[in-house]
Regions:
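Extreme N-terminal tail/first-helix region
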Residues: 1-26
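A short small-residue
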Residues: 1-2, 43-47, 98-106
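Short amphipathic alpha-helical segments with heptad-repeat character
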Residues: 8-15, 60, 64, 112-115, ...
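Structural signal for well-ordered, non-membrane alpha-helices
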Residues: 18-29, 67-71, 75, 119-133, ...
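Short secondary-structure junction/hinge motifs that connect adjacent elements
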Residues: 27-46
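Short, contiguous alpha-helical
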Residues: 40-97, 136-180
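Acidic/histidine-rich alpha-helical segments that form the ligand environment
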Residues: 92-139
């Protein structure tokens, strides 16, 4: 799927990927939905999240927290309070540790609550997009607080691209779960 470059493409991609993710989740048995990941050596040495996330709750908690990053960043900067996208003290070289903090934060969150949270935060992100223009979303420099990127790029990353990431993990989980 090509990366969205218009508001409508962004909304469509985010919602389409979100629906696909829930269809994949709903196709799993309850036992599979609640089972711990068992990726073994299949993904050993790849991205840190393969070792960090233990189950689907962790994936949904992660998605929710990245929605919150986007929502807080946009709301703060739009109201005139200069705020970086990532939480302090993190930067793009150290944000992996921030993801570990998110993981730790949701260790006691039940799967059902994580599902409710990510569905609610997705809806909030979609509402946030409504009043924005194509220029605000996809023109570099239109919003000075987006730096050398665009707001739309951050939105794609926190929605459609992240849902694709979640589906990749879900598919790997289905494969390893079926092999057990």
């Amino acid at each position: 799927m090509p990366r969205p470059t218009t508001k409508q493409d962004l909304i469509t991609a985010a919602n389409d990927q979100f629906i696909k993710m829930w269809k994949l989740f709903d196709a799993m048995s309850e036992a599979e939905q609640n089972a711990a990941f068992n990726f073994g050596d299949t993904y050993n040495g790849k991205e840190a999240h393969w070792n960090r996330d233990e189950n689907l709750r962790d994936v949904f908690g992660h998605l929710h927290e990245w929605h919150q990053l986007l929502l807080n960043w946009v709301r703060s900067n739009k109201s005139g309070v200069a705020t970086p996208f990532l939480l302090a003290p993190y930067n793009w070289k150290s944000y992996g540790q921030m993801n570990v903090e998110f993981w730790e934060k949701h260790r006691a969150t039940p799967l059902s609550a994580a599902i409710d949270m990510v569905k609610a935060s997705h809806a909030e992100v979609m509402s946030l997009l409504e009043p924005l223009t194509n220029e605000e979303l996809f023109t570099k420099g239109a919003l000075p607080w987006t730096g050398t990127s665009t707001l739309g790029s951050y939105c794609v990353s926190a929605t459609a691209s992240h849902y694709e990431w979640a589906m990749k993990k879900m598919k790997a989980h289905r494969k390893t779960y079926a092999a057990e």
